[in-house]
Amino acid sequence: PRTYYAAMATGGVWKSVDGGVSWAPIFDDQPTTSIGAIAVAPSDPNVVYVGSGEANIRGNVAPGLGIFKSTDAGKTWAHVWKQTGQIGTMVVHPRNADIAFAAVLGHAFGPNPERGVYRTTDGGKTWQQVLKKDADTGASDVALDPSNPLVVFAGLWQARRQPWGLTSGGPGSGLYVSRDGGDTWTQLTGHGLPDGPWGQVGVAVRRSRGRRVYALAEA
């Protein structure tokens, strides 16, 4: 509980082993310093996934180079998915460190087909795009139900960055759920959720009570 990792927008990955009193850089030998997400496997704290490319898409946002993985708590890294763009969230299965999801926002300044939610079931050797809307819509968040990891929630965000501004929102944005581990997805509407169009979407599942889900929607 005294070990922490921190992702920096342009400063790589840092680690503390004394509860945050001191920090050391552990990613400086890698080809990118723009970090969007860190996920530590609950079943094996030596397994750490890093999604590069921060998803706060300001005018001078730095693109990432895909996904990196460590199996020795950050001492060494493998470049397991090579794509440019932004990754905002990663999450690891609570009992299987080989299963992980990535919310890929993609390139901030234009349409690109790699946007969406990706899943690996073999420890990062291969990644499958399991949720995709269109080339203008990326994934802004992904969350697992810790008590039932077959239940996965994801937020999609239709967004386009220009040097002078940001276009956020449109028919592509929405909140989705999968009840079979990411194989199939259903968009959630109504029942208290605001009418569209939406912008950026965030989602979280309460750890102690998986049926309680929190969603934050720009609407």
Predicted regions and their residues:
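Beta-propeller blade termini and top-face loops
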Residues: 1-219
